[in-house]
């Protein structure tokens, strides 16, 4: 019967009673009783079933009415089971109560059990509550810490813990209780956890020892391994007091255990008897294949040489003990890596005796390293971290640290380098840089300096002046170029160069002395640059610890010597001695720098620095830096003992550091020439550093220049060249070189004088690599330089050219135009053919250059920029210009160098490109870049300069002209030549011209000082462009020379022109202009002059002020467009490209350029005239025709896209722009923009119309603008028929207007062309140019058209800048557009045309406007 049935029984029985009444009363009673019993039985069984089913989940049969029997059976089973379990439990209890139970009395007495256990554990027991107080400690603590039990009980555990271990200990303490309930979340932490901590030992005070020891030194810590149990169950049961405690057993860690029980890392250092590092052997670390070994070595050495880290030992005491006992062992110490990893280290040293004489020879120290993977120590090595300041301030500490790598390197090459000197402390710091006593100079230590003079490789260390004291260094650091690494934007460094180049700058001082020190130093410098240590170069130098490594100057100069010894070894000086050691030491001072540097190196494609282990990469970098320095005349640097060993190396090291080295060498060898060269170099370096403002830009440029720069570098040293190339960190090296040069500028004179004899000796050695400009050794090295420079050139062959070439071959001038060396990604290609030129130029220019450099010194910021721009016209125009302009607005403006740098649009490199490599080269040939040409022109107006010109790079170098040879027209033939070509204003237009092609980049650099800078740029640019065009047409700049033959022809023409113009003074140039009919052309562009004047009145000052901060490159962009226009004239395709490039550059720079467009416009007048003249002179009508054709073609192509105007500039610019833009990290942007422009040009009309419609919605004048655009399209087609004129006139107008057009390129970038400009002006820029010119002249055209057109452009490219700029420009545009020659007369109008071109970039009809604007040369009037 089922339970359910039973449940129903009562009901059933009731019904039965009613239905079946008993017949008899007795039966009725019996029947009812049975029923009740059954009902009750059913109820109980039902309840039982419920209990069973509730307790048993396996009774499935109960789901269906189980019968009573089944329920009872299951119940019985369960009851039995329960009883059995009870019996088992009782039996267990009995067992627990047995005699053997742990709860019973044991064989071992409880009192003795604890001590025995502790003895077996070799530790002591202590209990700490959650507040950190010791509530119990075992008596045997005395055996370990010398404290008595009562001394520690109820005291804070933190009193005996090392401050660095307190946080780790705190993590293991139980959490505080909440509402009396402790460890709510700690129940799972019952397992023991192990950690290490240092506990203070109570040591008896030794009176004598205490007197001489600091309180920290009196403290001795014992490293203990603690096994902690936070919440034992037993403790919980006993009470709450212990529940919140942590029970620890601390045991002593044996020395073997301390020093990395398994697979320890280690490296060996060799020290002289004074403890200075002589050599660093990192083979074991390298073999470990662990990442960041350079950083760990650097930091370990820093820590080892730093003040005691609260321990009772110091490096000095350690070696004293080793000296007395023959061996010594340090306690375990810790330091942290850049990534925060804690490293435990221990150093064991043995006294090394001469096996023959048994005399004490030195110490061999083995550093055991163990990385702690568990837990992060926020400041595991505060002392180590503090080492940097101590290293900077503490010679011994720093020396020891930096010295160890250097000495290791130096010692092999020559202990004389200060390794053995008492002043080696400073030297050791220097060693960090170069592996020689160079650091001594760096570190403020008399000993250091004395070794530096003694060593000559200390020249880098001559930075007795605080490395940080020289702001110039930081700006010039390739850090900027590299950077993305760059810790601080190079822009910061830009002003740093402002101090007299090299006066404070360790680079200049270092340039004179430490050459081999450079290798290690160069690595640091490169690292610093990579990290973006804008100003840290000096600080690096001053701080032997972290920053010392970064000192580019040290890296640059010293490595040249070091590399001379071992060109392959970045520690050239150390050669086989473990370049890594020096690099590591350097890294120690700059761990971050090294890391960043490695990153940037990889970014640059120069992982070689860090990738191949800094030993290899650094070697290459050092070699490059050294070689360049040598090329630049730094061979003198090798004058010291290092000199002989480094002669060959120096040659191979020419490239990255070659420029700087040769520059330094030149300074040393020809102190007088170098004095001026150094000043000029210093400024150039500053500008270069400024130019390489952003680490990203630097990184891109470096990446681009990596292969290319190396090519130029290779010319110096074949084997080393390759390495140098691999060291695409050339930028870094360049920065180092720049820094070095900067430091050397002022100190250079003194150092030059001091080192001059040495330099002469070194010169011979260095000249091999760089055909140093030093007269004595320049020719000697010339053949090698020739080897480096694809083109020939005796050392004499234009020291200017040699210097320029040097710069080119150097990082700054990876290519002839590689003044941006690192930036020259594209330029390198363009100038690869002319690399030889770069090297040779460097040499040639070097000798000639020093005097001129002095002159240019005044323009030093420009000089820096200009010289590099000469080299790197195309590749870095944008980048260099930005930094230079932004960093040195005035420099750009006032300084011809800047102009030259600007002027060398293709030389833009001069301004910016050089920063990377040329900058260092420039320092020597600061004017060299700009001046080298000028110097060449002056000294060798025809031959030297021609030599340079044949060298494509030198052509780019012509930006030397932008140096504003105009200040010295006669003295600067090239500049004059270009000025004549730009004759409108030899002084101003050259800058405009030069700036225009790449001036935009330059302008960007000059951002801050756009007004003056623009003129300077334009003026210099003109001269420079001529030359750069010769060296590298826009085509070359855009990519590897697109047409070598065409370039050769252009170069030949430019050479001839250069020779002619170089030999003619301003008057002669004017006569030539008249003969060419340039004055007439200028008269045609009278409107331009008024505009220029007006704009000049406004000058870039307003625009620059508006955009100076925002658009460093933007402003230059506008300036360049004018130059671009001029280039169009001067060099039909090249200049056309240049102009376009300028415009594009301008466009690119135009990101913040539109206001500057206005600024440029004032200058447009002169630049226009100069461009017209230059075009006519250089290219004649052919160039004009070519320019016209190019413009027409480009305009036609863009007609589809709104970048018609932009197109003309853009397409050529695309080529050139790719070069310099790529170099400026805008390479990709420029490419994308170019491709985008091409597409947009095809769709430009569509886009422009759409944009116009959109802008019409936004602006009431859009309808008018559309009409104007239609007219413009018609007129542009007409105007484009005379694109040459347009080109010429736009060249002139474009200098001003062109910059406006470059505004469009900014649009390519995030900013609209209007960005930073009045919206109305923006339209003016957008469309005002060609379409609005006619209409603008008659109407409000400029403003309306620009408004309408630009909106189109803006809509397509939507660059806010454009809008901002046009308002200023619109006023001018409208006022000028009214003039008959809107394009010619109105830079604004032409600017508008360029803006249209810009807009074209932006996708407007600019293409059409561009042609119109281009026409204005001839069709200016028709434009209206």
Swiss-Prot record:
CDD domains: bHLH-PAS_NCoA3_SRC3 (cd18949), PAS (cd00130). Present in a complex containing NCOA2, IKKA, IKKB, IKBKG and the histone acetyltransferase protein CREBBP. Found in a complex containing NCOA3, AR and MAK. Interacts with ATAD2; the interaction is enhanced by estradiol. Interacts with CARM1. Interacts with CASP8AP2. Interacts with CSNK1D. Interacts with DDX5. Interacts with ESR. Interacts with ESRRB; mediates the interaction between ESRRB and RNA polymerase II complexes and allows NCOA3 corecruitment to ESRRB, KLF4, NANOG, and SOX2 enhancer regions to trigger ESRRB-dependent gene activation involved in self-renewal and pluripotency. Residues 1097-1304 are annotated as: Acetyltransferase. This is Nuclear receptor coactivator 3. The keyword Transcription regulation applies. It is an enzyme of class 2 (transferase). Residues 1023-1093 are annotated as: Interaction with CREBBP. The lineage of its organism: Eukaryota, Metazoa, Chordata, Craniata, Vertebrata. Its main location: cytoplasm. Its EC number is 2.3.1.48. It catalyses: L-lysyl-[protein] + acetyl-CoA = N(6)-acetyl-L-lysyl-[protein] + CoA + H(+). The modification Phosphoserine is found at residues 214, 551, 569, 601, 694, 728, 857, 860, 867, 1033, 1330. Residues 1-38, 408-493, 501-520, 537-674, 709-730, 755-798, 912-945, 1273-1321 are annotated as: Disordered. It comes from Homo sapiens (Human). Changing residue 647 to Q: Does not affect acetylation by CREBBP. GO terms for cellular component: chromatin; cytoplasm; cytosol; extracellular exosome; nucleoplasm; nucleus; protein-containing complex.
């Amino acid at each position: 019967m089922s339970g359910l049935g039973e449940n129903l029984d009562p009901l059933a029985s009731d019904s039965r009673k009613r239905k079946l009444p008993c017949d008899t009363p007795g039966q009725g009673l019996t029947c009812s009783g049975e029923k009740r019993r059954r009902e009750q039985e059913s109820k109980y069984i039902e309840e039982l079933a419920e209990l069973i089913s509730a307790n048993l989940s396996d009774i499935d049969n109960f789901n269906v009415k189980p019968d009573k029997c089944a329920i009872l059976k299951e119940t019985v089973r369960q009851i039995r089971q329960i009883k059995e379990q009870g019996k088992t439990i009782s039996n267990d209890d009995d067992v627990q109560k047995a005699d053997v139970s742990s709860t019973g009395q044991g064989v071992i007495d409880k009192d003795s059990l604890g001590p025995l256990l502790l003895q077996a554990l070799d530790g002591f027991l202590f209990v700490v509550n959650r507040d950190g107080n010791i509530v119990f400690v075992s008596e045997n603590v005395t055996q370990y810490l010398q404290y008595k039990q009562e001394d520690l009980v109820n005291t804070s555990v933190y009193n005996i813990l090392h401050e660095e271990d307190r946080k780790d200990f705190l993590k293991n303490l139980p959490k505080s209780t909440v509402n009396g309930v402790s460890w709510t979340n700690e129940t799972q932490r019952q397992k023991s956890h192990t950690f290490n901590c240092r506990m203070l030992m109570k040591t008896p005070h030794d009176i004598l020892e205490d007197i001489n020891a600091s309180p920290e030194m009196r403290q001795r810590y014992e490293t203990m391994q603690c096994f902690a149990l936070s919440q034992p169950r037993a403790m919980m049961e006993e009470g709450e007091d212990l529940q919140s405690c942590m029970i620890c057993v601390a045991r002593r860690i044996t020395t073997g255990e301390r020093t990395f029980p398994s697979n320890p890392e280690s490296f060996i250092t060799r020290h002289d008897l004074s403890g200075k590092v002589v050599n660093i052997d990192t083979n074991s670390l390298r073999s470990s294949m662990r990442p960041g070994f350079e950083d760990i070595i650097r930091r370990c050495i820093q820590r080892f040489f730093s003040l005691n880290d609260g321990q009772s030992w110091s490096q000095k005491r350690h070696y004293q003990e080793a000296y007395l006992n023959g061996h010594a062992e340090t306690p375990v110490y810790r330091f942290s890596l850049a990534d925060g990893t804690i490293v435990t280290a221990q150093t064991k040293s043995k006294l090394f005796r001469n096996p023959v004489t048994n005399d004490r020879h030195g110490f061999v120290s083995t550093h055991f390293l163990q990385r702690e993977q568990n837990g992060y120590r926020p400041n595991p090595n505060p002392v180590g971290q503090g080492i940097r300041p101590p290293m900077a301030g503490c010679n011994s500490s720093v020396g020891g640290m930096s010295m160890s790598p250097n000495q290791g390197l130096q010692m092999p090459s020559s202990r004389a380098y200060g390794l053995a000197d008492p002043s080696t402390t400073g030297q050791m710091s220097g060693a960090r840089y170069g592996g020689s006593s160079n650091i001594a100079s760096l570190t403020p230590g008399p000993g250091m300096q004395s070794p530096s003079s003694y060593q000559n490789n200390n020249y880098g260390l001559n930075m007795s002046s605080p490395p940080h004291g020289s702001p110039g260094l930081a700006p010039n650091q390739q850090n900027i170029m590299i950077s993305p690494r760059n810790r601080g934007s190079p822009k910061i460094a830009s002003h740093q160069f402002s101090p007299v180049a090299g006066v404070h700058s360790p680079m200049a001082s270092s340039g004179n002395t430490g050459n081999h020190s450079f290798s290690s130093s160069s690595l640091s410098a490169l690292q610093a640059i990579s990290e973006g240590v804008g100003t840290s170069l000096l600080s690096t130098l001053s701080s032997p610890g972290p920053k010392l490594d970064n000192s580019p100057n040290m890296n640059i100069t010293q490595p040249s010597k070091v590399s001379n010894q071992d060109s392959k070894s970045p520690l050239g000086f150390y050669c086989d001695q473990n370049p890594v050691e020096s690099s590591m030491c350097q890294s120690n001072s700059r761990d971050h720098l090294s890391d960043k540097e490695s990153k940037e190196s990889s970014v640059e494609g120069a992982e070689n620095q860090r990738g191949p282990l800094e030993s290899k990469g650094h070697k290459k970098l050092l070699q490059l830096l050294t070689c360049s320095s040598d090329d630049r005349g730094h061979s003198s640097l090798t004058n010291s003992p290092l000199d002989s060993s480094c002669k060959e190396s120096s040659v191979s090291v020419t490239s990255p550091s070659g420029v700087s080295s040769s520059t330094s060498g030149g300074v040393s060898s020809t102190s007088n020439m170098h004095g001026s060269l150094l000043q000029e170099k210093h400024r150039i370096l500053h500008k270069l550093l400024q130019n390489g403002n952003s680490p990203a830009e630097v990184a891109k440029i470096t990446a681009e220049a990596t292969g290319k720069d190396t090519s130029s570098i290779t010319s110096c040293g074949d084997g080393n060249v390759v390495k140098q190339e691999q060291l695409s960190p050339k930028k870094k090296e360049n920065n180092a070189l720049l820094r070095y040069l900067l430091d050397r500028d002022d100190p250079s004179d003194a150092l030059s004088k001091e080192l001059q004899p040495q330099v002469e000796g070194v010169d011979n050695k260095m000249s091999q690599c760089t055909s140093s400009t030093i007269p004595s050794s320049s020719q000697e090295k010339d053949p090698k330089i020739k080897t480096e420079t694809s083109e020939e050139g005796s050392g004499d062959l234009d020291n200017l050219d040699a210097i320029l070439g040097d710069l080119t071959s150097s990082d700054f001038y990876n290519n002839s135009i590689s003044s941006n060396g690192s930036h020259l990604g594209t330029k390198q290609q363009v100038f690869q053919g002319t690399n030889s030129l770069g090297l040779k130029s460097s040499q040639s220019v070097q000798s000639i250059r020093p005097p001129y450099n002095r002159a240019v010194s005044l323009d030093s910021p420009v000089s820096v920029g200009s010289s590099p721009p000469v080299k790197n016209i195309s590749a870095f125009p944008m980048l260099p210009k930005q930094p230079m302009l932004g960093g040195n607005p005035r420099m750009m403006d006032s300084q011809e160098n800047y102009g030259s740098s600007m002027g060398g649009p293709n030389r833009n490199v001069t301004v910016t490109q050089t920063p990377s490599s040329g900058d260092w080269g420039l320092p020597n040939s600061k004017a060299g870049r700009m001046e080298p040409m000028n110097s060449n022109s002056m000294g060798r107006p025809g031959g030297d300069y021609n030599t340079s010109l044949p060298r494509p790079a030198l052509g780019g170098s012509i930006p030397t002209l932008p140096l504003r040879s105009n200040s010295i027209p006669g003295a600067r033939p090239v500049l004059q030549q270009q000025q004549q070509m730009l004759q409108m204003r030899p002084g101003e237009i050259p800058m405009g011209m030069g700036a225009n092609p790449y001036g935009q980049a330059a302008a960007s650099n000059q951002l801050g000082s756009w007004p003056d800078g623009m003129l300077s740029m334009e003026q210099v640019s003109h001269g420079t462009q001529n030359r750069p065009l010769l060296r590298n047409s826009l085509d070359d700049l855009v990519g590897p020379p697109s047409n070598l033959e065409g370039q050769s022809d252009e170069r030949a023409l430019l050479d001839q022109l250069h020779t002619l113009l170089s030999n003619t003074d301003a008057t002669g140039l004017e006569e030539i202009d008249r003969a060419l009919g340039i004055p007439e052309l200028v008269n045609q562009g009278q409107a331009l002059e008024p505009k220029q004047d007006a704009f000049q009145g406004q000058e870039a000052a307003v625009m620059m002020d508006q955009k100076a901060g925002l658009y460093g490159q933007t402003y230059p962009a506008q300036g360049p467009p004018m130059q671009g226009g001029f280039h169009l004239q001067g060099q039909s395709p090249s200049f056309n490209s240049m102009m376009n490039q300028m415009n594009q550059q301008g466009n690119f720079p135009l990101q913040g350029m539109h206001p500057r467009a206005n600024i440029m416009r004032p200058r447009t007048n002169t630049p226009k005239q100069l461009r017209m003249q230059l075009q006519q002179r250089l290219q004649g009508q052919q160039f004009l025709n070519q320019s016209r054709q190019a413009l027409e073609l480009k305009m036609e192509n863009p007609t589809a896209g709104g970048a018609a105007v932009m197109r003309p500039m853009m397409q050529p610019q695309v080529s050139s722009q790719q070069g310099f833009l790529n170099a400026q990290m805008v390479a990709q942007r420029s490419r994308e923009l170019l491709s985008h422009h091409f597409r947009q040009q095809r769709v430009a009309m569509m886009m422009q119309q759409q944009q116009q419609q959109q802008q019409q919605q936004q602006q009431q004048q859009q309808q008018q603008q559309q009409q104007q655009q239609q007219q413009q399209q018609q007129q542009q087609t007409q105007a484009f028929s005379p694109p040459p004129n347009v080109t010429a006139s736009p060249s002139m107008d474009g200098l001003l207007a062109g910059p406006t057009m470059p505004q469009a390129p900014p649009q390519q970038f995030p900013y609209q062309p209007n960005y930073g400009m009045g919206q109305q002006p923006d339209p003016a820029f957008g469309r005002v140019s060609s379409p609005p010119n006619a209409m603008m002249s008659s109407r409000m055209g400029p403003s309306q058209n620009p408004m309408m057109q630009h909106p189109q452009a803006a809509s397509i490219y939507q660059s806010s800048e454009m809008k901002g700029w046009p308002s200023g420009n619109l006023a001018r545009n409208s006022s000028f557009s009214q003039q008959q020659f809107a394009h010619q007369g109105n830079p604004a109008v032409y600017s508008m045309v360029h803006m249209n071109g810009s807009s074209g970039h932006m996708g407007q009809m600019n293409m059409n406007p561009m042609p119109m604007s281009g026409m204005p040369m001839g069709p200016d009037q028709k434009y209206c």
